[in-house]
Amino acid sequence: MSGAQPSQGQPSESANSEFVFRRDYRAPRALVLSAWTDPEQLAEWWGPHGFTNRVCELDPRSGGRLRIEMHGPDGTVYPVVGVYEAVESDRVVFTCLPLDEQGAPLFEIESAVTFAERASGGTTQTVRTRVRRVSPGAAIHLVGMEAGWSQSLERLENHLAQRGHVRPAASVRA
């Protein structure tokens, strides 16, 4: 049900880690896209189970910035800043930098999210996330990334369902 393709081994400070997630939704492409580009909607589902987003600032256009502060169940704040590389009707590409307690980047995450209309109706969403430029000692922060993305996309499923859209047609491994 996670919709995830397992990564190749444990992340390391010199290795690139890539994760691919694919989900099919019985919702129009424009509605799935808006869940990624509207700050109010993104704040409702972004992050693992139990996380909230008290700050969610998005400027979804090429060169636009994003800033999110995820709050974990234990109260820990996980700030993320980034830049949109492309925002189109069928894809969103952005780079995120999770920050440490001093505001220094831990690593860089490049994500490409594509939205394809299905002939039978609905939308296939594919998320490709690649980790790059891991700071010395920051690899430990990557351990739960695949599970975190899976949980975040489960929250997106629930978000779309709460907005009156039927649950995804399928969650499959890419």
Predicted features, each with a name:
Residues 21, 66-68, 91-96, 125-127:
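Short hydrophobic/aromatic-rich beta-strand segments that constitute the beta-sheet cores
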Residues 1-52:
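Hydrophobic ligand-binding cavity/cleft-lining segments
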Residues 20-21, 40-77, 168-174:
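Short beta-edge strand/loop motif at the mouth of beta-sheet-based domains
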Residues 1-13, 158-174:
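Basic/polar N-terminal segments that are highly enriched at the extreme N-terminus
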Residues 23, 55-58, 80-86, 108-117:
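Hydrophobic/aromatic beta-strand elements that line small-molecule binding cavities or substrate pockets
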Residues 29-30, 60-61, 85-91, 114-124:
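A short, structured loop/turn motif at beta-sheet edges
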Residues 99-150:
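Beta-strand/loop substructures that line and gate deep hydrophobic ligand-binding cavities in soluble
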Residues 13-15, 60, 74-78, 103-107, ...:
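A generic structural micro-feature
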